[in-house]
Amino acid sequence: MSNYEDLRGAAANEEIILDDQGIPSVMVKVPLVYLDELGIGSAHTPHPAFIINDKVVPYIYVSKYINVIKNNRAYSIPNQDPANCITFDRAVEVCYNKGAGWHLMTAAEWGVLHNLITAHGLEPRGNTNNGRHHVKTYEHGVLSPQNPTNVYRTLTGTGGKAWEALGVCDIMGDVHKWVVARLVDGEIQIIPNNNAAIHKTDLGANSKAWKAILQDGSLVAPGTNGTLKFDYTGNPANATSGFHITTTVEHKQTDDGAGYGAKDFGTLTAKSGVTIPDILKALALFPNTDKTGRGFIYFRNNGERLLFRGGSCGNGGLAGEANGTFYNPRSISLVSVGLFSAYVDPALYA
């Protein structure tokens, strides 16, 4: 990887950024944007992806390509079999291993990408049907020679411009991407603003960094009365669309065999009388002006459930940059789950 320019694509917002060992990743620069500019509320407030350690940063960097892991570090480089069979904790580790500023993509960072895609009227496509797009089947990437039987991952960035949005390739499909957010017994929990970008932030199951969300958007200790939660509207069942955002779990499932919730993200609603704060829309955990057909959202409300997003090569019309899966534990390791790393210069929030 000595000729770094060979890694670059054509997008003007791409930059090559080196880790603390001088190894490059192709990154996409995302400038500061405000919530009102994205159609979220009326306040001219920075999107939370640009607030770190109570400082407003002028830009962030996200991976252009689904990452590959080399020497226990995550890299954004083209023409690679995407990293897969990786747990949440391992995904966090291989990003932190790159040095200060490097981290697993956060809920805030995915959220700003989703909302920018919406604001620009983009409709990204990707590998959603065994190496091809499920509708435009003439669009395809290069199948990975490392695929096991009946797995159809494509090499990073080989799907062409139609599989790119805002300079980011494969945000839809190929493999799901771990993102820093979770449910605990249905309660939505995040790391405030973009503080998960701070090096070695504790993202463990028992970390005090996790916060729950009230209806007014304030962040509080998990378990506080009245926080926002995913809950079924009746008895849990497999792939039921009967669920909403509420403040009290009334239909908690007792085990995974009780099923899971699944519906188009654009149809997600709140229980009558529950107010959805702008922060959920900013993080793409609740639709703002979203159309349907941009991905499904899934959940279970028993135990800790970490988030991955985007869909995979077998998800068809269920994939999309709005796709979000809250039904697996942090220990899950699948051939269809990988990651994006991200980077923010620590000098910007020191």
Locate each region found by the language model.
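Charged, compositionally biased non-catalytic regions
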Residues: 1-15
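Short low-complexity stretches enriched in small and charged residues
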Residues: 11-21, 129-134, 292-301
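Extracellular adhesion/carbohydrate-recognition regions
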Residues: 15-101, 186-250, 305
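Short catalytic/ligand-binding loop motif for oxyanion handling, primarily in non-cytosolic enzymes
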Residues: 70-71, 111-114, 177, 185-188, ...
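Structured loops at beta-to-helix junctions and adjacent beta-edge loops in soluble globular domains
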Residues: 10, 21-22, 28-38, 63-65, ...
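Short secondary-structure boundary/capping segments
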Residues: 118-123, 183, 192-195
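Short aromatic-cysteine micro-motif
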Residues: 45-170, 201, 253-256
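C-terminal, surface-exposed recognition/capping segments
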Residues: 1-2, 143-149, 154-155, 162-165, ...
